[in-house]
Each structure stands twice: as structure tokens, then as C-alpha cells.
Amino acid sequence: MKHSSLRRSLLLAGITLPLVSFALPAWANALPASVDKQLAELERNANGRLGVAMINTGNGTKILYRAAQRFPFCSTFKFMLAAAVLDQSQSQPNLLNKHINYHESDLLSYAPITRKNLAHGMTVSELCAATIQYSDNTAANLLIKELGGLAAVNQFARSIGDQMFRLDRWEPDLNTARPNDPRDTTTPAAMAASMNKLVLGDALRPAQRSQLAVWLKGNTTGDATIRAGAPTDWIVGDKTGSGDYGTTNDIAVLWPTKGAPIVLVVYFTQREKDAKPRRDVLASVTKIILSQIS
């Protein structure tokens, strides 16, 4: 992912596609007219393409907007990566404590945590935390290598029923986010379903599921996106992502003070390669979606 400090930008693909494309999953609910209008107006004013998937785990209702269209996931893929590591740790109890040494040649331009720990290395658990909470690109590549390569991450996604997630390249190449490029993409609906299974369902054992939630809740990069649109007394665990074409992404589980958790995936991408990130758009989407729940 490309960064200016800890901030991020992301992508665009196929802006002229209709609001809902292809066949939506069986769980797709009709989008309330007021929400459809608000999201369409926000998307139009921001001059980009917006994808949203929300699951209210309390009553099973969903809100979907362009949720079957592909978007470049950029660093939101690191959520799936960390989950794949946790899944492997279920059969390898010492995996998270395994010590990984790496070289200066392994360091990418965005490596805030791995650079600090170059002299003595890091454990797999520490690399996962760096990947989720600081979006450290070097940590992500080291974890992919530890799992056995890109195919291992994709195989894990398939194992939990996610047929849309596809990781084709390593960091930082996966962030080019070119329009209509299917590489390194997923759909909002697929990512929301996977988050629900991994953080709130039984795709992982309780200990691993709890650890994944802890990492998400400790994220340092999402204060201006979904968290900014949620009530301040709610707990939010998220993973942001960004790349070229001003793409700005966030995927999250929100724990209200009362009621069941909410899964929310927001992908946004723009028309120009050098477009600036729009974290404000993600915050606005969150407010629109949550207004339908309260």
C-alpha cells in the first residue's frame, strides 16, 4: 500500500457500471430507497465508485450497494492474511511464537514496525499485529512467505467459502488498483461474509477468533474512516486499505453499546490515478448505514 505517513489512498474500476451488477448472494436484501438515494448522491458528489456491504448480525438484515462488483482490496487483504495465519496456528501450536529474522533487503518503503525491529527480528504474532494495526507491508510479505506463498492465502479464503477473494501479487505491487483489473480484488459482499465468519462465526476456533478481534480493535490507521462515522462509545475493529486512483477502503466489525455486532465493508475508488484519498466518504457512508439501524 502507498502511504503518506500512516494515511492511505486507493483505486477505481468501472465507474459506469449500474448500482447493482450481476447476481447478488441469496442473503441480499432490497436496499431501502432512502439509503440507495443517499449513497448514490454521495458517490456522485465524490466522483467515484462506491461499494458497500453491511450485515446486522442481530436480525440478519443486510444493506448492499454495488456489493457484487469487484473492487481492489489493497491492504484490506491483510485481514484475510492474518486469519490464514491464525487458521494454520490451530494445527501448529507454536506458530505464533515462531521467531522470524529478516534482512534490510526485505524492507519495503512502508515498514514502520519491521524497520524498527530489523536487528532482532519479530515473532509471527508480532508480524500479524504489525500487519493489521500498522499495515506494515514488509510484515505482510514475510507472513505470506511463512504460509507458503500467495496461493496459500487464496486457498484459505476458499476453505471458508469465499470464492471472490483473489490475491495475485505481493506488496507493494498489489496496490496499482487499475480500473477493470481483476487482480487483487474482491467484492464487498464476499468480504463482509468472510469477516462475519472469521470474527463472529465459527470459521476459527474461539482462541484464534478472539485474537483476530483483538488485533482489529487495536488498529491505528482507521480513525478517519468507519470509526469516524460510528458513535464514540461503540467499539470498532477494522482494517484499512489504499492504493492508486484515490481508492480508500475500510472493513470493520462494530460492537454497539447495546445489541449485536455489525459487519461493515466500504470500498471507494476514483477516476484519476493521482486522486487523493477520501476517508470522509467512508465516514459518511457509515453514518448513512447506521442511521438505518438505530
Curated annotation (Swiss-Prot):
Substrate binds at residues 239-241. It holds the Pfam family Beta-lactamase2. It catalyses: a beta-lactam + H2O = a substituted beta-amino acid. Keywords: Antibiotic resistance, Hydrolase, Signal. PROSITE patterns: BETA_LACTAMASE_A. Its EC number is 3.5.2.6. Gene3D superfamilies: DD-peptidase/beta-lactamase superfamily. One of its GO terms (biological process) is beta-lactam antibiotic catabolic process. One of its GO terms (molecular function) is beta-lactamase activity. Residues 1-30 form the signal peptide. The active site is at 75 (acyl-ester intermediate). The class A beta-lactamase family has a specific amino-acid numbering system, sometimes called Ambler or ABL numbering and often misspelt as Amber. A multiple sequence alignment was used to derive a consensus sequence and then the consensus was numbered taking into account insertions and deletions. This allows use of identical numbers, e.g. for active site residues, despite differences in protein length. UniProt always uses natural numbering of residues, hence there appear to be differences in numbering between this entry and some papers. Belongs to the class-A beta-lactamase family. This is Beta-lactamase. The gene is blaA.
